[in-house]
Amino acid sequence: MSITSVASVFKGDFAIGSQITVRGWVRSRRDSKAGISFLAVYDGSCFDPIQGVVPNNLENYTNEVLKLTAGCSVVMTGEVVESPGQGQAFEMQVTKVEVAGLVEDPDTYPMAAKRHSIEHLRELAHLRPRTNIIGAVARVRNCLSQAIHRFYNEQGYIWVSTPLITASDTEGAGEMFRVSTLDLENLPRTDKGTVDYAEDFFGKESFLTVSGQLNAETYACALSKVYTFGPTFRAENSNTSRHLAEFWMVEPEVAFANLDDAAKLAEDMLKYCFKAVLEERRDDLEFFAQRVEKTAIERLENFVTSDFAQIDYTDAIEILKACDKDFEYDVEWGIDLHSEHERYLAEEHFKAPVVVKNYPKDIKAFYMRLNDDGKTVAAMDVLAPGIGEIIGGAQREERLDVLDARLAEMELSQEDYWWYRDLRRYGTVPHAGFGLGFERLVSYVTGVSNIRDVIPFPRSPKSANF
């Protein structure tokens, strides 16, 4: 006898007549007049629960089985049989039910209701994985994570663990969480009256990272092809469906590569991930197509068969100006494209994923390679129908004199980036990479529009519960 997952039963890994044991939680119990009960038990391995047909001759039928309610945990043993009902091929003829844990008060159990709003579930983040939607999101998120690691491993990339604590601001935006052990009631001061961070734990101002990119570049300039995949932090006071204070980023960096190479890598990676989720999590995608976004599957299938359109930022501005769309934000050369502009390009103009390249330097970071026109940098955004920007990347500035000039323009200290400048002094090399906001990817795949619902415990302004 073996303990097995519900998913493996539905895959047909066990022949009819096999004795199995399933461990999980009760989704529902239904009693028949014939003296049997039907337990729907799920273990999180797949979307559907398995049905256990429980006879009333079990020892604990009256005093335990008939007390089972949604959320109770059980160990259910029995025989695999063909299911006469529609919806699943197999069920269990149960010979033993062990109750691991009861729900104290079924009437007040928060997950007992048939359906909660997804907004309400955020207040119950410790229990929401028990719902169909958040369980499905978790499995899709896992599938995408595994696909990303597989993709880069198969391509010969090395995974680099970049630090979460840093003294560098990758974006130059200043919206960073400070890390300090100083006594806030008794801050040490310099002669000028400013906080003396020399007395702090790291001996200088330190922050939670906004990106692993700069650190990844150091390894790319020695190991050729690397990537990071980990949490990043932004102290933006933004309460929108697209922003989190803590989120995960995928950031590849490639030596001897240019912007076109980065664009091709982004396309290959996205298509690989979407193919994986279409193959491996079809049951969850069917749920999302039924309950959340009816085009969820169709959208992914179209994506993996589409050629990415490519366009310069300047040409994109002209397209936006020429269209008869009434945008909320005015369109002119030099603006950072807003979501409405991005979605028009991807959904209405090109009707396909699109890579917008060569943005004005004044709206991009210091490390992006300055183009020959002196006005634009070799930056790109990948725009996807249905969401807009999903990836941002660039060829990095490998020329020390140009990098120093850009640092000066943005009033950033060469001293703070001395190690980053060293890469340009000792065997500099053209290199490129990009960043993918992982939660936006999960949101795109599932159709769940608020990224607070695609990360287990969302962190946002005034919200750090659990």
Curated annotation (Swiss-Prot):
It catalyses: tRNA(Asn) + L-asparagine + ATP = L-asparaginyl-tRNA(Asn) + AMP + diphosphate + H(+). Keywords: Aminoacyl-tRNA synthetase, ATP-binding, Cytoplasm, Ligase, Nucleotide-binding, Protein biosynthesis. InterPro entries: Aa-tRNA-synt_II, aa-tRNA-synth_II, aa-tRNA-synth_II/BPL/LPL, Asn-tRNA-ligase, Asp/Asn-tRNA-synth_IIb, NA-bd_OB-fold, NA-bd_OB_tRNA. CDD domains: AsxRS_core, EcAsnRS_like_N. Its EC number is 6.1.1.22. One of its GO terms (biological process) is asparaginyl-tRNA aminoacylation. Disulfide bonds: none annotated. Its main location: cytoplasm. The keyword Nucleotide-binding applies. It holds the Pfam family tRNA_anti-codon. It is found in: Cytoplasm. GO terms for cellular component: cytoplasm. GO terms for molecular function: asparagine-tRNA ligase activity; ATP binding; nucleic acid binding. Belongs to the class-II aminoacyl-tRNA synthetase family. PANTHER family: ASPARAGINE--TRNA LIGASE, MITOCHONDRIAL-RELATED, ASPARTYL/LYSYL-TRNA SYNTHETASE. Homodimer. This is Asparagine--tRNA ligase. It comes from Shewanella pealeana (strain ATCC 700345 / ANG-SQ1).
